[in-house]
Amino acid sequence: MNAFKIILQSVNDVKDFVNTVSKFNYDIDLVSGRYVVDAKSIMGIFSLDLTKPIEVRVFADKFDNLLSELKRFII
């Protein structure tokens, strides 16, 4: 597992994030406090506190393409 932090500041950011991570076949979770949701679930993401940074957990060894596509969200 690999992890990094992101920030999603608008509804469009959430939509773009979900569309991007949905292209990848490996599991990706989002963690906010004690809550863990599937990063490919738009409804799950909206259940999180989006005013704070969110931890992304990627369950893959090689995910450089994902990082390059998400670089605008990474903090």
Predicted regions and their residues:
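Short glycine-enriched loop/turn motifs at secondary-structure junctions
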Residues: 1, 31, 48-52
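Amphipathic alpha-helical interaction surfaces in cytosolic regulatory modules
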Residues: 11-27, 35-50
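C-terminal structural segments of small proteins and small subunits
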Residues: 47-75
